[in-house]
UniProtKB/Swiss-Prot annotation:
Parts of the chain that traverse the membrane: 106-126
Mitochondrial intermembrane side: 127-268
Protein's cellular compartments: Mitochondrion inner membrane
UniProt record, GO biological process: protein import into mitochondrial matrix
Keyword tags: Membrane, Mitochondrion, Mitochondrion inner membrane, Protein transport, Transit peptide, Translocation, Transmembrane, Transmembrane helix, Transport
PANTHER family documented for this protein: MITOCHONDRIAL IMPORT INNER MEMBRANE TRANSLOCASE SUBUNIT TIM21
Pfam family, one: TIM21
One GO CC term on file: TIM23 mitochondrial import inner membrane translocase complex
Membrane topology reported for the UniProt record: Single-pass membrane protein
Protein's name according to its UniProt entry: Mitochondrial import inner membrane translocase subunit TIM21
Ranges for region Disordered: 66-89
Family of the protein in this entry: Belongs to the TIM21 family.
Underlying gene: TIM21
Major site of localization recorded for this protein: mitochondrion
Amino acid sequence: MHMIQRVSSIGLRTLRSSNIGSIRSLIVLPILSIKPTYIRQTQAQINLKPQALLLNLLLHHHHHHHHYYSTKTAPPPPPPPQPPQDKNAKGKKILNRINRAFTFSLSTLLVVGAAGISVLVVSLILSELFLPSGDTRTFNKAVKLIEKNEQAQKALNFQSGQRLKAYGIVSADKWVRNRPVQSVKTKRKDGKDHLIMKFQVESDNGKYGVVSLEQIDNSMWNTEFEYISLDVPGFKRIYIIEPPKNQLIPKIGGGSGFLGLNWGPKKD
């Protein structure tokens, strides 16, 4: 009895053969079973030594028991399940559009309104400062005419070229100085706007007088004074610009009338 050593994955195992001299005899493998295709050997394999032949068979058997797998051709994973459909999705979509349209309209309205208010404020400021019909321009023109009048210089005791202080009518409290100038604009029968204004002027030596004037707005860019009068305590009324004949002009009195003036016919 001869012994044949075989190499396998679990170590060396001893196999027995009844006739080692004959290659064609049956080889008993207690662990591995050899397929019939391994027994059919070519003439070249028969001429090999028994040990080499057995090793060749075992290696061939071990090679064919390895399987290789690849994911290259594997099918794609199934798609995720679809979320359940909302029955109110269409209504929510319409409501969302309405909400967005309302928000856009409200924002646009606010922007347009703010822009309109800004334009109005700017136009009022510009007209007040630069247009001839503005109160500020009228006030400044009247003060300059009074400063150039000789009768006003004598009554207020100031020299030519000196500036006068001009401000709103002072109340009983002499500490109050920066009161706004009183003015009102009305439309008369001639269809033109008439601006009536009253303010106070004061020289550096403390002498003061009350100015009353009326201005006619022929147009936005063309104005003219109807009259300008100056009342200084202890002096007769001084007309910087003479009013038309029999023109009703306000007279300084007890202050019971509009703008603190008493209205009545002109007196010489």
